[in-house]
Amino acid sequence: MKHLIIKSKKKVFGSLLGRNLSAFKGNGIDFREIREYIYGEDAKRIDWKISAKFQKPYVKEFDEERELNIIVCVLSSGTLNFGSKRLKSDLISEIVALLGFSAIKYDNKFSLLIYENAPVIHTKPTKTQNGIIGAVERVYNYDFLGKNYDFTFVNYLNRFKKSILFLIGDFYLHPELNLKHETYVLWIRDQFEENPAEMGEIDLIDPVTLKEIHTNFNKNAINRLKKEIEKKDKEFIEYLQKEKFRFAKIYTHEDPFYKLTELLR
Protein backbone atom coordinates (compact mmCIF):
# COMPACT_ATOMS: atom_id res chain seq x y z
CA MET A 1 0.00 0.00 0.00
CA LYS A 2 2.76 2.45 0.96
CA HIS A 3 4.72 1.60 -2.19
CA LEU A 4 1.59 2.11 -4.29
CA ILE A 5 1.05 5.60 -2.83
CA ILE A 6 4.68 6.65 -3.28
CA LYS A 7 4.79 5.35 -6.85
CA SER A 8 1.54 7.10 -7.81
CA LYS A 9 2.55 10.43 -6.24
CA LYS A 10 5.90 10.31 -8.01
CA LYS A 11 4.25 9.79 -11.39
CA VAL A 12 1.67 12.53 -10.87
CA PHE A 13 3.70 15.22 -9.14
CA GLY A 14 7.01 14.32 -10.75
CA SER A 15 5.72 15.88 -13.99
CA LEU A 16 5.37 12.51 -15.66
CA LEU A 17 1.60 12.54 -15.67
CA GLY A 18 0.07 14.54 -18.32
CA ARG A 19 0.97 18.02 -19.09
CA ASN A 20 -1.98 17.48 -21.41
CA LEU A 21 -4.58 15.97 -19.07
CA SER A 22 -7.45 17.94 -20.55
CA ALA A 23 -10.04 16.00 -18.54
CA PHE A 24 -8.71 17.51 -15.32
CA LYS A 25 -8.03 20.97 -16.68
CA GLY A 26 -11.33 21.31 -18.53
CA ASN A 27 -11.27 24.05 -21.12
CA GLY A 28 -10.87 26.67 -18.43
CA ILE A 29 -14.12 28.43 -19.28
CA ASP A 30 -17.90 28.13 -19.09
CA PHE A 31 -20.05 29.35 -22.00
CA ARG A 32 -22.31 32.29 -21.05
CA GLU A 33 -23.79 33.97 -24.13
CA ILE A 34 -23.39 34.97 -27.78
CA ARG A 35 -22.93 38.63 -28.73
CA GLU A 36 -21.91 40.73 -31.72
CA TYR A 37 -18.23 41.17 -32.40
CA ILE A 38 -16.84 44.58 -31.38
CA TYR A 39 -14.36 46.18 -33.75
CA GLY A 40 -10.82 45.91 -32.42
CA GLU A 41 -11.32 42.64 -30.54
CA ASP A 42 -9.21 39.60 -31.30
CA ALA A 43 -10.65 38.20 -34.54
CA LYS A 44 -9.72 34.70 -33.37
CA ARG A 45 -12.68 34.86 -31.00
CA ILE A 46 -15.19 35.07 -33.86
CA ASP A 47 -17.47 32.04 -34.15
CA TRP A 48 -17.70 31.66 -37.91
CA LYS A 49 -20.61 29.20 -37.93
CA ILE A 50 -22.83 31.53 -35.94
CA SER A 51 -21.57 34.56 -37.89
CA ALA A 52 -22.51 32.89 -41.18
CA LYS A 53 -26.00 32.20 -39.86
CA PHE A 54 -26.64 35.83 -38.85
CA GLN A 55 -24.59 37.39 -41.66
CA LYS A 56 -22.50 39.44 -39.22
CA PRO A 57 -19.60 38.59 -36.90
CA TYR A 58 -20.49 37.10 -33.52
CA VAL A 59 -18.36 35.93 -30.61
CA LYS A 60 -19.08 33.65 -27.67
CA GLU A 61 -18.72 35.04 -24.15
CA PHE A 62 -17.25 32.79 -21.50
CA ASP A 63 -16.77 32.88 -17.75
CA GLU A 64 -13.80 31.39 -15.96
CA GLU A 65 -14.62 27.82 -15.15
CA ARG A 66 -14.99 26.79 -11.52
CA GLU A 67 -13.17 23.82 -10.06
CA LEU A 68 -14.12 20.43 -11.45
CA ASN A 69 -15.71 17.65 -9.44
CA ILE A 70 -14.04 14.28 -10.03
CA ILE A 71 -15.97 11.16 -8.99
CA VAL A 72 -14.49 7.66 -9.18
CA CYS A 73 -17.18 4.97 -8.95
CA VAL A 74 -16.06 1.35 -8.44
CA LEU A 75 -18.74 -1.21 -9.33
CA SER A 76 -18.26 -3.84 -6.65
CA SER A 77 -18.06 -7.49 -7.67
CA GLY A 78 -16.45 -10.61 -6.27
CA THR A 79 -14.79 -11.10 -9.66
CA LEU A 80 -12.50 -8.15 -8.84
CA ASN A 81 -10.82 -10.41 -6.27
CA PHE A 82 -8.99 -12.27 -9.04
CA GLY A 83 -5.70 -11.89 -10.83
CA SER A 84 -2.86 -13.97 -12.25
CA LYS A 85 -0.27 -11.17 -11.96
CA ARG A 86 -2.00 -9.12 -9.29
CA LEU A 87 -5.59 -8.78 -8.15
CA LYS A 88 -7.88 -6.61 -10.22
CA SER A 89 -8.83 -4.85 -6.99
CA ASP A 90 -5.16 -3.93 -6.41
CA LEU A 91 -4.97 -2.48 -9.90
CA ILE A 92 -8.07 -0.43 -9.12
CA SER A 93 -6.39 0.89 -5.95
CA GLU A 94 -3.50 2.18 -8.06
CA ILE A 95 -5.90 3.75 -10.56
CA VAL A 96 -7.75 5.52 -7.73
CA ALA A 97 -4.42 6.87 -6.47
CA LEU A 98 -3.39 8.15 -9.90
CA LEU A 99 -6.77 9.78 -10.56
CA GLY A 100 -7.00 11.22 -7.05
CA PHE A 101 -3.56 12.83 -7.03
CA SER A 102 -4.14 14.11 -10.57
CA ALA A 103 -7.41 15.72 -9.47
CA ILE A 104 -5.87 17.66 -6.59
CA LYS A 105 -2.82 18.55 -8.68
CA TYR A 106 -5.17 20.67 -10.79
CA ASP A 107 -7.02 21.96 -7.70
CA ASN A 108 -10.16 19.89 -8.28
CA LYS A 109 -12.38 18.06 -5.80
CA PHE A 110 -12.18 14.26 -5.67
CA SER A 111 -14.56 11.70 -4.19
CA LEU A 112 -14.72 7.90 -4.22
CA LEU A 113 -17.82 5.74 -4.51
CA ILE A 114 -18.00 1.96 -4.12
CA TYR A 115 -21.40 0.70 -5.21
CA GLU A 116 -23.21 -2.62 -4.75
CA ASN A 117 -27.02 -2.45 -4.71
CA ALA A 118 -26.54 0.84 -2.87
CA PRO A 119 -23.55 3.05 -2.09
CA VAL A 120 -21.47 1.23 0.53
CA ILE A 121 -18.69 3.82 0.53
CA HIS A 122 -18.98 7.43 -0.64
CA THR A 123 -16.21 9.71 0.58
CA LYS A 124 -16.60 13.43 1.04
CA PRO A 125 -15.09 15.55 -1.75
CA THR A 126 -11.47 16.34 -0.93
CA LYS A 127 -8.63 18.45 -2.27
CA THR A 128 -5.96 17.13 0.11
CA GLN A 129 -3.33 14.42 -0.20
CA ASN A 130 -4.51 12.85 3.06
CA GLY A 131 -8.01 12.65 1.63
CA ILE A 132 -6.72 10.84 -1.45
CA ILE A 133 -4.66 8.42 0.63
CA GLY A 134 -7.76 7.69 2.71
CA ALA A 135 -9.78 6.93 -0.44
CA VAL A 136 -7.07 4.59 -1.75
CA GLU A 137 -7.01 2.77 1.60
CA ARG A 138 -10.80 2.27 1.43
CA VAL A 139 -10.45 0.48 -1.91
CA TYR A 140 -7.30 -1.41 -0.97
CA ASN A 141 -8.86 -2.81 2.22
CA TYR A 142 -12.32 -3.44 0.81
CA ASP A 143 -13.50 -7.06 0.67
CA PHE A 144 -15.03 -7.59 -2.78
CA LEU A 145 -15.65 -11.34 -2.32
CA GLY A 146 -19.32 -12.30 -2.30
CA LYS A 147 -20.36 -8.88 -3.61
CA ASN A 148 -22.09 -7.71 -6.77
CA TYR A 149 -23.75 -4.53 -8.00
CA ASP A 150 -27.04 -3.67 -9.64
CA PHE A 151 -27.89 -0.95 -12.11
CA THR A 152 -29.38 1.47 -9.58
CA PHE A 153 -25.98 3.17 -9.50
CA VAL A 154 -27.06 5.17 -12.57
CA ASN A 155 -29.93 6.87 -10.71
CA TYR A 156 -27.74 7.41 -7.66
CA LEU A 157 -24.98 9.12 -9.64
CA ASN A 158 -27.45 11.30 -11.54
CA ARG A 159 -28.51 12.87 -8.23
CA PHE A 160 -25.25 14.80 -8.13
CA LYS A 161 -24.33 17.87 -10.12
CA LYS A 162 -22.57 17.30 -13.40
CA SER A 163 -19.05 16.01 -12.80
CA ILE A 164 -16.23 14.13 -14.45
CA LEU A 165 -17.01 10.49 -13.69
CA PHE A 166 -14.68 7.50 -13.88
CA LEU A 167 -16.67 4.27 -13.87
CA ILE A 168 -14.48 1.28 -12.94
CA GLY A 169 -15.34 -2.41 -13.14
CA ASP A 170 -14.72 -5.63 -15.06
CA PHE A 171 -18.10 -5.28 -16.79
CA TYR A 172 -19.26 -8.85 -17.03
CA LEU A 173 -22.60 -7.14 -16.54
CA HIS A 174 -23.38 -4.54 -19.18
CA PRO A 175 -25.37 -1.63 -17.74
CA GLU A 176 -27.13 1.08 -19.72
CA LEU A 177 -25.08 4.15 -18.86
CA ASN A 178 -27.72 6.88 -19.02
CA LEU A 179 -25.51 9.28 -17.12
CA LYS A 180 -25.51 13.08 -17.23
CA HIS A 181 -21.83 13.24 -16.33
CA GLU A 182 -18.78 13.39 -18.58
CA THR A 183 -18.05 9.70 -18.21
CA TYR A 184 -14.89 7.65 -18.71
CA VAL A 185 -15.18 3.86 -18.52
CA LEU A 186 -12.19 1.96 -17.10
CA TRP A 187 -12.53 -1.71 -17.95
CA ILE A 188 -10.43 -3.93 -15.67
CA ARG A 189 -9.45 -7.43 -16.76
CA ASP A 190 -6.85 -10.16 -16.27
CA GLN A 191 -5.43 -11.95 -19.31
CA PHE A 192 -6.17 -15.35 -17.78
CA GLU A 193 -9.91 -14.56 -17.74
CA GLU A 194 -9.96 -14.11 -21.50
CA ASN A 195 -7.41 -16.79 -22.32
CA PRO A 196 -7.53 -19.49 -19.61
CA ALA A 197 -5.28 -22.53 -19.58
CA GLU A 198 -6.50 -26.12 -19.69
CA MET A 199 -6.72 -27.49 -16.15
CA GLY A 200 -8.93 -30.55 -16.52
CA GLU A 201 -11.40 -31.29 -13.73
CA ILE A 202 -11.22 -28.69 -11.01
CA ASP A 203 -13.14 -27.33 -8.03
CA LEU A 204 -13.75 -23.58 -8.11
CA ILE A 205 -15.43 -21.04 -5.84
CA ASP A 206 -17.82 -18.59 -7.49
CA PRO A 207 -16.47 -15.24 -6.21
CA VAL A 208 -19.95 -13.66 -6.27
CA THR A 209 -22.15 -16.40 -4.79
CA LEU A 210 -19.28 -18.12 -2.90
CA LYS A 211 -20.68 -21.48 -4.00
CA GLU A 212 -18.34 -24.33 -4.91
CA ILE A 213 -18.40 -25.41 -8.55
CA HIS A 214 -16.97 -28.64 -9.95
CA THR A 215 -16.13 -28.22 -13.63
CA ASN A 216 -13.91 -29.51 -16.39
CA PHE A 217 -11.59 -26.91 -17.90
CA ASN A 218 -10.84 -28.92 -21.04
CA LYS A 219 -10.17 -27.50 -24.49
CA ASN A 220 -13.82 -27.52 -25.59
CA ALA A 221 -15.02 -25.82 -22.42
CA ILE A 222 -12.35 -23.15 -22.73
CA ASN A 223 -13.24 -22.45 -26.36
CA ARG A 224 -16.91 -22.04 -25.43
CA LEU A 225 -16.00 -19.70 -22.59
CA LYS A 226 -13.70 -17.59 -24.76
CA LYS A 227 -16.33 -17.25 -27.49
CA GLU A 228 -18.96 -16.17 -24.96
CA ILE A 229 -16.66 -13.56 -23.41
CA GLU A 230 -15.59 -12.27 -26.83
CA LYS A 231 -19.23 -11.97 -27.91
CA LYS A 232 -20.30 -10.03 -24.82
CA ASP A 233 -17.22 -7.83 -24.84
CA LYS A 234 -17.77 -6.98 -28.50
CA GLU A 235 -21.35 -5.97 -27.72
CA PHE A 236 -20.18 -3.74 -24.88
CA ILE A 237 -17.51 -2.09 -27.03
CA GLU A 238 -20.07 -1.40 -29.74
CA TYR A 239 -22.39 0.13 -27.14
CA LEU A 240 -19.64 2.37 -25.73
CA GLN A 241 -18.62 3.49 -29.21
CA LYS A 242 -22.21 4.14 -30.27
CA GLU A 243 -22.87 6.25 -27.16
CA LYS A 244 -19.49 7.97 -27.60
CA PHE A 245 -18.09 7.01 -24.20
CA ARG A 246 -14.34 7.24 -23.85
CA PHE A 247 -12.97 4.02 -22.40
CA ALA A 248 -9.79 2.08 -21.74
CA LYS A 249 -9.31 -1.61 -21.10
CA ILE A 250 -6.55 -2.10 -18.53
CA TYR A 251 -5.10 -5.51 -17.67
CA THR A 252 -3.53 -6.48 -14.36
CA HIS A 253 -0.09 -6.92 -15.92
CA GLU A 254 -0.13 -3.40 -17.37
CA ASP A 255 0.94 -0.08 -15.89
CA PRO A 256 -2.30 1.94 -15.68
CA PHE A 257 -0.40 5.21 -15.77
CA TYR A 258 0.20 4.96 -19.51
CA LYS A 259 -3.36 3.89 -20.34
CA LEU A 260 -4.79 6.77 -18.30
CA THR A 261 -2.43 9.30 -19.83
CA GLU A 262 -3.50 8.23 -23.31
CA LEU A 263 -7.20 8.28 -22.40
CA LEU A 264 -7.14 11.70 -20.74
CA ARG A 265 -4.86 13.68 -23.01
Give, region by region, the residue ranges found by the protein language model.
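Von Willebrand factor
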Residues: 128-163, 173-174, 190
